[in-house]
């Protein structure tokens, strides 16, 4: 038995909701061992607000556990994104994600554009990694120029169109050729968001390896075995190595699920900080971005990372770290801890 509730606020600083409601969901499973999605809807009264902050809470009444999501709906700069919804082409079930693995086939619902022709462009994303937290570099960005153009026609009755997403990159669709406002689908690696192959494991390992170490593993006849050897040498025994691998790549997958923008979550600034430093003790969010605090908030020894939201035509989940040379010592301490096989939570 789960209670779903929401509270809608005018902005991030508001304390009194303009609307709230809740509902109970009781799930009767014929086979408890099989995971299934429960999809429904709950009508909202937003008082005519075009933009508001929504807090959604799901509470398991049997287990006395809950999960909360806070998001801004109708953010300025979002443009036309909310008019599009990707669904499974086989059964029409919403995918609730604009990031899909390469090779996916997707159907997009956009009833507001029935019968219209949409102009599409594919943009590649830089293949590199974000710079360390203390340097002046940045994170991978989309290419300014599209490498291919295409058009799709929205079904005049169903209000849908289908796409075959074979090539990685940003597939951006816009109703007007001269206006970049539109909707983007992000095509990532085949295993996204999980770490499924040796190649998936090697990429994030670059954060804690030197260039020669990385190249040696890349050129090894058995890459997965070489990666396991790296962790075993770092940890000193198999049990510690297994635990370090589990936690390191769990953070990679967690970054993919929460921080993916135009690049996989582990290749973003927030993903970088999460993998190396762990989960912050405190997070502050507002329309400008996020602040992560590791340690006690009023302690002068804490670490505070500030991420600034970037407005662009493709995504509203692109936050860039304000890098600072003062982070250099903490960065190398954490990297060295990982290299010694110790799971570090700052």
Q: Which functions belong to the PLM regions below?
A:
Residues 1-147, 155-157:
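Intrinsically disordered, low-complexity terminal regions enriched in Ser/Thr/Pro/Gly
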Residues 9-13, 59-61, 297-299, 310-312, ...:
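Solvent-exposed coil/turn segments that connect beta secondary-structure elements
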Residues 65-74, 180-191:
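Edge beta-strands of extracellular beta-sandwich domains
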Residues 75-99, 186-212:
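Low-complexity, Pro/Ser/Thr- and charge-rich linker/hinge segments at domain boundaries
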Residues 119-181, 245, 256, 260:
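Structured core of small recognition/catalytic domains
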Residues 194-245:
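Early exported N-terminus immediately downstream of N-terminal targeting peptides
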Residues 223, 231-251, 256-266, 271-316, ...:
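A cross-family detector of function-defining hotspots
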């Amino acid at each position: 038995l789960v209670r779903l509730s929401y509270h809608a606020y005018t902005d991030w600083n508001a304390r009194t909701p303009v609307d709230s409601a809740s509902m109970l969901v009781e799930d009767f499973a014929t086979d408890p061992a099989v995971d299934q999605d429960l999809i429904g809807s709950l009508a909202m009264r937003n008082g005519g607000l075009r933009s508001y902050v929504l807090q959604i809470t799901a509470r398991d009444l049997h287990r006395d556990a809950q999960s909360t999501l806070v998001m801004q709906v109708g953010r300025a700069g979002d443009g036309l994104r909310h008019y599009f919804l990707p669904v499974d082409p086989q059964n029409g079930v919403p995918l609730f994600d604009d990031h899909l693995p390469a090779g996916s086939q997707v159907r997009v619902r956009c009833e507001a554009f029935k019968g219209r022709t949409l102009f599409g462009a594919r943009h590649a994303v830089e293949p590199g990694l974000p710079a360390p937290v203390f340097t002046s570099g940045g994170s991978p960005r989309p290419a300014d120029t599209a490498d291919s153009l295409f058009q799709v026609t929205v079904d005049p009755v169903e209000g849908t169109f289908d796409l075959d997403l074979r090539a990685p990159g940003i597939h951006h669709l816009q109703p007007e050729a001269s206006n970049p406002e539109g909707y983007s689908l992000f095509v990532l690696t085949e295993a996204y968001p999980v770490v499924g192959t040796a190649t998936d494991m090697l990429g994030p390992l670059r954060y804690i390896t030197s260039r020669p170490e990385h190249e040696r593993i890349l050129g090894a006849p058995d890459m997965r075995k070489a990666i396991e050897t790296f962790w075993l040498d770092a940890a000193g025994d198999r049990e510690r190595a297994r635990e370090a691998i589990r936690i390191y790549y769990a953070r990679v997958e967690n970054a993919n699920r929460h921080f993916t923008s135009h690049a996989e979550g582990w290749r973003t600034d927030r993903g970088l900080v999460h993998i190396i430093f762990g989960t912050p003790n405190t997070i502050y969010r507002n329309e400008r971005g996020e602040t992560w605090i590791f340690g006690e908030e009023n302690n002068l020894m804490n670490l505070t990372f500030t991420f600034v939201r970037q407005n662009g035509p493709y995504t509203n989940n692109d936050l860039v770290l304000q890098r600072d040379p003062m982070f250099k010592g903490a960065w190398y301490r954490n990297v060295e801890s990982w290299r010694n096989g110790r799971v570090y939570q700052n």
